[in-house]
From Swiss-Prot:
TM ranges: none
UniProt-listed SUPFAM superfamilies: Class I glutamine amidotransferase-like (SSF52317), P-loop containing nucleoside triphosphate hydrolases (SSF52540)
Function, in words: Catalyzes the ATP-dependent amination of UTP to CTP with either L-glutamine or ammonia as the source of nitrogen. Regulates intracellular CTP levels through interactions with the four ribonucleotide triphosphates.
Protein name: CTP synthase
Residues holding ATP: 15-20, 72, 239-241
Amino acid sequence: MTTRYIFVTGGVVSSLGKGIAAASLAAILEARGLNVTIMKLDPYINLDPGTMSPTQHGEVFVTEDGAETDLDLGHYERFIRTKMNRRNNFTTGRIYEEVLRKERRGDYLGATIQVIPHITNAIKEKVLEGGEGHDVAIVEIGGTVGDIESLPFLESIRQLGVELGRDRTLFMHLTLVPFLGAAGEVKTKPTQHSVKELRSIGIAPDVLVCRGDRAIPSNEKAKISLFCNVEERAVISLKDVDSIYKIPALLKAQGLDDLVTKRFGLECREADLSEWENVIYQEANPTGEVTIGMVGKYTELPDAYKSVNEALKHAGLFNRVSVNIKYIDSQNIEAKGTEVLEGLDGILVPGGFGERGVEGKIMAAQYARENNLPYFGICLGMQVALIEFARHVAGLENAHSTEFNKDTPHPVVGLITEWIDEKGNIEQRHEESDLGGTMRLGAQLCHLIEGTKAAEAYKGLTCVERHRHRYEVNNTYRERLEKAGLVFSGLSTDRQLVEMIELPNHPWFVAGQFHPEFTSTPRDGQPLFQGFVAAAVAYQKRDLG
């Protein structure tokens, strides 16, 4: 199979939405029957985002094969059917590590290792490898043109443009066309300078996607075309919209997919965007609204919980309601008490690390349990629910996780030291293991118990969800907790580890050790999120009753 490559760069400012634009174009091409994948090349030195602060970088998105990747891969999976893997995201740090490892082995036969050709060749190999088996591979280059960090990536894609030729490569550049209120017009000069910068390193863009808060007038499009040496039909206006799921239709309306397929000589059907039209209709026509309190420690940056936010919205579409997310810093609960939780239709405690704010999360779980308020715990959210139950129902005073208190008399949650991964390999960890890349990661089978809310949500007795954690329920306490009324509704592949818990006499109190938000999409949703939002709707109606 001959793979075509679309390279996506950004200029003027960061955060223009390269990932959304790339994913939206991929969605249109997929709707035309093409097999599409998307890659993200990140210019930072970290090997992966796994140990980066969520408040700096946003969430870490986990792929099926256990790669800890950039949150843009979450956008990719929400827009197209193709599942991402570790080949879809790599960093400068990963490239340098591999090149240096080869140098130590002697693979370069004593050569002087340089950015060109050794680093650029390694980048090109990764790009070509990631595109194998697909009709089209869209490659997003992180950062902004002009950044020193991005230069090796830009040089690599420049070389690929020459080596593969124009019939297999296309360069798409996102840029900002700001509107100046004082002048009463949009300004194209930043775009002209950005393209000049890009051309100075040998890349001539074929398509310009011009971002702004309004559509660009046709006369300004003509001006951009003239000064940037790009066909006028290839100057695409991408204005701000109230829903990112409207962007595929916006791009299609301007003929971007036709331009791409003709450039590549691809014969394919017209794009059918009816699924996206349905998503947009559901989003615009809710029959009600529920308020979900998200209790976490990274609440100052919503992107830290990007996939959870999106999964709640998707569940809202399924239940025909809009979901209002109220971010609650768990430390505020510790300081002010549970009155900050009043007026909610449900509580969600997402994953997290570290002791800060953990008691506030435990208080949130207790509030939900005692007030019959729908509760959904994810990863740490399951562990705090179990700790709360152990303390206040099972009579295990001062029960805790050894992550937060190594001297707790009742370590109901502890460091997992050994487990069997999805390939049947035995994985082992200990207290001194590195933080990066040492967690239980990736998609794993979960056995569900018949008659539970978990089995009801998944409409079966198994599910496959993705993990990212080091700590697990301590099996020593399972029998005592079960006797107190806790149901272990999901177990690992070998049935040795607790994957899900729930309360049978509660309207909806369900928690999982895995991260179901990573598999939610706007077209299909995710069973547990759909069940949680449905329970919030029912709680609200009963409350109003």
